[in-house]
A protein has these predicted regions:
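Helix-to-loop junction immediately C-terminal to a conserved catalytic motif
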Residues: 59
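Conserved ABC transporter NBD signature motif
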Residues: 67-75, 84
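Conserved ABC ATPase "signature" region
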Residues: 115-131
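Conserved ABC ATPase signature
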Residues: 135-139, 143
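Catalytic Walker B motif of ABC-type/P-loop ATPase nucleotide-binding domains
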Residues: 160-163
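Helix N-cap at the start of a conserved alpha-helix in ABC-type nucleotide-binding domains
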Residues: 171-173
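C-terminal boundary and immediately downstream tail of ABC-type ATPase nucleotide-binding domains
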Residues: 224-244
């Protein structure tokens, strides 16, 4: 069985409800989907669609109020949260690095490892070896995002969750991160699930797309088809920018 034929992550009727203004709203509403290993998935939709809320349920940063997430056919609740997040890692809009050097940040997740090659992990995300001894506070946002990515990859995750990781970057840096994501997905057979508010970015990344509106999965398929020839009325309204 090839890399892309393996189903690595499933959601079944996944639901999350949160209190708001004295009532309860569903940020994720009965969402069922299967993710294959080694593919890139773009989660798109208008603001308030529940995209980030959905992402946070996949590695238990938040807990659902209904349904379940399965990782290799086992409920994610059967894994210790720390162990689960090593295999289903997440990067956020603003990268967080610990005080100290880049090397300190990389070695933080590597306790118990007999050998640690900072140069290798930096090169893998497109940074030169001399970055290892630079202070984390001296890096640009784009460089910090690469270091955060290198730190996640050291743990050899199967799934990488990305919550708008380029939203704070300039267009050139954003393109470089996009190219890096695609390269790593191919090289490592890594499943990438990325939330983006930018349809053009989703088109550049390609792969598969999921359109969410008001917590519901409206349609899914090839990203290019989803964003150029959607099959649903809500999909057409989203593409024509009627949904904000």
């Amino acid at each position: 069985m090839s890399c892309n034929e393996t189903i690595i992550l499933k959601t079944r009727e996944l639901t999350r409800e949160v209190p708001k203004n004295g009532s309860v709203i569903r940020t994720v509403d009965s969402l069922t989907f299967e993710f294959n290993k080694g593919l890139v998935y773009n989660v798109v939709g208008p603001s308030g669609a529940g995209k980030s809320s959905f992402l946070r349920l996949l590695n238990r940063l938040d807990e659902p109020t209904g349904g379940e997430v399965l990782y290799y056919d086992k409920p994610v609740t059967s894994y210790a949260p720390t162990d689960l997040r090593r295999k289903i890692s997440m990067l956020f809009q603003i990268p967080y690095l610990f005080p100290g050097t880049v090397r300190d940040n990389l070695s933080f997740c590597c306790s118990g490892k007999q050998e640690f090659d900072a140069d290798f992990h930096l090169r893998r995300v497109g940074l030169k070896a001399e970055y290892a001894d630079m202070g984390a506070d001296d890096l640009s946002v784009g460089e910090k995002q690469r270091v955060a990515l290198a730190r996640s990859l050291f743990l050899e995750p199967d799934v990488l969750l990305l919550d708008e990781p380029t939203s704070a970057l300039d267009p050139t840096s954003s393109r470089k991160i996009e190219e890096l994501i695609l390269s790593l997905a191919r090289e490592l057979c890594l499943t990438v699930i990325m939330v983006t508010h930018n349809p053009d970015q989703a088109l550049r990344l390609g792969g598969k797309g999921l359109l969410m509106v008001k917590g519901k999965l409206i349609e899914s398929g090839d990203t290019a088809e989803l964003l150029t020839d959607p099959s649903s009325d809500l999909g057409r309204r989203y593409v024509s920018k009627e949904l904000e």
